[in-house]
């Protein structure tokens, strides 16, 4: 199954044709797809109307620098701001994480989308791509925040996606533009980076997104192309039974598998349920690549959003304004 990107704020005829394809599980939206709150709500409805089956509509609405929808939405603080409070008041910090998750998820769901790919559970240890997207460098602290964030998302009827397995936070390289290699042994990864993923799985996380990072002491290929990581460790050792997403096959670190068809097949053969094809110019080639493959369509049904107030109902809900105010008072930024 593929999650695809579309070019703009309205669907083109070609994109409507893509949505008819059996392999298309849904759409990932980006800043380029956003003009206003009403427009993105209408776009979500148009995607659903154009497809013959339920579509999973997703976004990265983490907060901080990774927030695709801004005007008309709460300006969500980065997770690191919440993590910094843990040392002085762990209980308050965890409550804020749950509120942050609730606020993010309620606004995304009100716009007609199913999920935001969240939370980031990588360790905050200097990676250029992760930075303040991570709660903390401490695995146990991130584990506690992970469970709280999953609870907040689930309270709104949004599935939670742990990313980027088995941990992207310790390598310096940004896999959007570079190859990233983590030389550590599996035992060290188990004691560090895997701890938050274990906590998230125990809390009921619904999906996991793979990293395009190579861990050569564990497997020779990037984790998203690795049966060792997906089937033996994530599913076998950690007991994860949910949906496994690849990261975007347009990222530089994904190119090690070869061209677009090779990347798609490598992810699916390794055990990914869904491959992200976020660049529209790659979609035709990816769709051609999956012709004839057996597709696990049922796996995604559990990720569809459950219940939503819509914007009128959400803005009339006192909890929305109260949560905005509490985050502002505590973290000192406009939400």
From Swiss-Prot:
Keywords: Cell cycle, Cell division, Cell shape, Cell wall biogenesis/degradation, Cytoplasm, Glycosidase, Hydrolase, Peptidoglycan synthesis
Enzyme Commission number, as recorded: 3.2.1.52
Keyword Cell division found: yes
Substrates-to-products reaction catalysed: Hydrolysis of terminal non-reducing N-acetyl-D-hexosamine residues in N-acetyl-beta-D-hexosaminides
Chief location category: cytoplasm
Annotated Gene3D superfamilies: Glycoside hydrolase, family 3, N-terminal domain
Family matches, as Pfam families: Glyco_hydro_3 (PF00933)
GO terms under cellular component: cytoplasm
Site (Important for catalytic activity): 174
Broadest EC class assigned to this enzyme: hydrolase
Binding, substrate: 60, 68, 133, 163-164
UniProt record, GO biological process: carbohydrate metabolic process; cell division; cell wall organization; peptidoglycan biosynthetic process; peptidoglycan turnover; regulation of cell shape
Name of this chain's protein: Beta-hexosaminidase
The species this protein was found in: Stenotrophomonas maltophilia (strain R551-3)
GN (gene name): nagZ
């Amino acid at each position: 199954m593929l999650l695809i990107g579309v070019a703009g704020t309205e669907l083109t005829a070609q994109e409507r044709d893509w949505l008819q394809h059996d392999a298309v599980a849904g759409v990932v939206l980006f800043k380029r797809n956003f003009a206003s709150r009403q427009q993105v709500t209408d776009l979500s409805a148009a995607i659903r109307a154009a497809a013959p089956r339920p579509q999973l509509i997703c976004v990265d609405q983490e907060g901080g620098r990774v927030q695709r929808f801004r005007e008309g939405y709460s300006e969500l603080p980065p997770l690191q701001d919440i993590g910094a409070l843990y040392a002085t008041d762990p209980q308050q910090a965890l409550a804020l994480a749950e509120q942050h998750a609730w606020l993010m998820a309620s606004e995304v769901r009100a716009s007609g989308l199913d999920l935001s790919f969240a939370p980031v559970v990588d360790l905050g240890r200097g990676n250029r791509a992760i930075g303040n997207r991570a709660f903390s460098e401490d695995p146990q602290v991130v584990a506690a925040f992970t469970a709280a964030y999953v609870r907040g998302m689930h309270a709104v009827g949004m599935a939670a996606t742990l990313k980027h397995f088995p941990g992207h936070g310790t390598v310096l390289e940004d896999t959007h533009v570079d190859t990233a290699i983590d030389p550590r042994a599996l035992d060290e990864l188990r004691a560090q980076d895997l701890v938050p993923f274990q906590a998230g799985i125990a809390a009921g996380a619904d999906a996991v997104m793979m990293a395009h990072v190579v861990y050569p002491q564990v497997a020779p290929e990037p984790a998203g192309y690795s049966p060792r990581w997906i089937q033996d460790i994530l599913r076998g050792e950690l007991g994860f039974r949910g949906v496994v997403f690849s990261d975007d096959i347009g990222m530089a670190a994904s190119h090690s598998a070869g061209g677009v068809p090779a990347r798609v097949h490598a992810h699916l053969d390794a055990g990914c349920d869904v491959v992200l094809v976020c660049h529209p110019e790659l979609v035709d080639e990816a769709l051609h690549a999956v012709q004839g493959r057996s597709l696990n369509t049922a796996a995604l049904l559990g990720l569809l959003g459950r219940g939503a107030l819509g914007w009128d109902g959400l803005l009339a809900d006192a909890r929305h304004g109260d949560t905005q105010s509490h985050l502002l008072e505590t973290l000192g930024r406009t939400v």
